Swiss-Prot record:
Recorded GO CC terms: cytosol
Native organism taxonomy: Bacteria, Pseudomonadati, Pseudomonadota, Gammaproteobacteria, Pseudomonadales
Name this polypeptide is given: Tyrosine--tRNA ligase
Stored PANTHER family: TYROSINE--TRNA LIGASE, MITOCHONDRIAL, TYROSYL-TRNA SYNTHETASE
Motif ('HIGH' region): 46-55
Binding positions (ATP): K237
GO biological process: tyrosyl-tRNA aminoacylation
Gene: tyrS
Length: 412
């Protein structure tokens, strides 16, 4: 593909692909990026050991910036994770231990490396400067520049209070910490651009303003639209749970299936955001109708899976899907469900198995699925899921409806 250089209007390209919601100074940022390589940062708190597809838009945006010659900084909030961003949340996050935070940082870094070429200095932890700053020093350096009256006007704070939900002083101070992060990254690393979701707008503006009030560099902020599927679901979730970006939490086959099964109305938009296809091809694929649109969904699934898990995983997932839906053959590309010979000998049923693996929420849900013909072993409907499994089950394909398929694997 043709990769833009930093001399071109990168903002126009990002707008065309659907990445831009708001910008603190659109023309100023376009000129700044055209003037030469800039340093941009994207921040995440280390609340889990992976990221999910709700974070994917930001990773792809950072990828485009790096392709255009700009320098990525990926900030993981080792310090701010202890507090939790209250933006548009109804309750406080649980407090994590230092060991949990570090394990999460390690997991997130592995996901980053799939999308952005990391160098030794690409990954930053805000504990580097926040752990060493004293409370009185922080109030003097940062607190003096913020008005409580103005902070109370921000949507994230106001909505929490309007709903009469508790907001601790710890959480109230989060926006000041994020503003300080931006200024410190500007001072230490020459960072001039912060990226974030639309819910981060107030936090980003505060960083831009703090730098100005302290006589620092001119900083810029760019937010992305908060994505939802056309049927109203928040990006990051599926009916089965979070759609994670690492294979340990979600099998590449299930990741591929998420994209293959997306709503027809989302195909063009998702291709623009989550693939690197030229926009002419995106528009062509997005305009397909009927059965032809399924071809576009396969292109989307292959592209998104190749970025998250590699080309081999994408091909294996596509091959596995063809095996399931076309000729009914078994395929090792399916996610495995393990069961022990000892449990099988004790009279393990399919209902037991699905509940133990948290695939179904209740016995009644399994029975309803079976009654509707949606529970099958190697294509054969299971009429009584409560009956003990019998015969040779190793390698059998277990299907739950039309879109969820697993391969049984027997272990000693």
């Amino acid at each position: 593909m043709s990769v833009p250089t930093h001399q071109q209007d990168l903002i126009a390209l990002l707008e065309e692909r659907g990445f831009v919601h708001q910008c603190t100074d659109r023309d100023g940022l376009a000129a700044h990026l055209a003037a030469g390589p800039a340093t941009a940062y994207l921040g995440f708190d280390a609340t889990a050991d992976s990221l999910h597809i709700g974070h994917l838009q930001g990773l792809m945006l950072m990828r485009w910036l790096q392709k255009a010659g700009h320098r990525p900084l990926l900030l993981i909030g080792g310090a701010t994770t202890r507090i939790g961003d209250p933006s548009f949340r109804d309750s406080s996050r649980p407090i994590l231990t230092e060991a949990q935070i570090q394990a999460n940082i390690d997991g997130i870094a592995r996901v980053f490396s799939r999308y952005v070429e990391l160098h030794d200095d690409s990954l930053v932890n805000n504990a580097e400067w926040l752990d060493g700053v004293g409370y009185l020093e922080f109030l003097d350096r940062v607190g003096r520049h913020f008005s409580i009256n103005r902070l109370l006007t921000f949507d994230a704070i106001r909505q929490r209070l309007d709903r009469e939900h508790s907001l601790s002083f710890l959480e109230f101070g989060y926006t000041l910490l994020q503003a300080y992060d931006f200024v410190e990254l500007s001072r230490r690393r020459g960072c001039t651009l912060q990226l974030g979701g639309a819910d981060q707008w107030a936090n980003i503006i505060n960083g831009v303003e703090l730098s100005r009030r302290q006589g620092g560099a001119q900083l810029f902020g760019l937010t992305m639209p908060l994505l939802a599927t056309s049927d109203g679901r928040k990006m990051g979730k599926s009916a089965q749970g979070a759609v994670w970006l690492n294979a340990e939490r979600l099998a590449p086959f299930d990741f591929w299936q998420f994209w293959r099964n997306c709503d027809d109305r989302d195909v063009g938009r998702f291709l623009a955001l989550f693939s690197e296809l030229p926009m002419d091809e995106v528009r062509r694929l997005g305009a397909l109708q009927g059965a032809e649109l399924n071809e576009a969904k396969v292109v989307l699934a292959n592209a998104a899976t190749a970025l998250a898990h590699g080309e081999h995983a994408a091909r294996s997932a596509a091959d596995a899907a063809r095996g399931v839906f076309a000729d009914g053959t078994r395929d090792s590309g399916l996610p495995m469900m393990k069961l022990s010979r000892a449990r099988l000998a004790q009279g393990l049923s399919l209902t037991d198995l699905l509940l133990e693996h948290a695939i179904q929420p209740s016995r009644s849900a399994v029975r309803r699925l079976a009654a509707g013909g949606g529970l099958r072993l190697d294509g054969t409907p299971v009429s009584d899921p409560d009956a003990p499994l019998a015969g040779e089950v190793d390698g059998l394909r277990l299907s739950l409806g039309k879109k969820q398929h697993l391969q049984l694997r027997l272990e000693d």
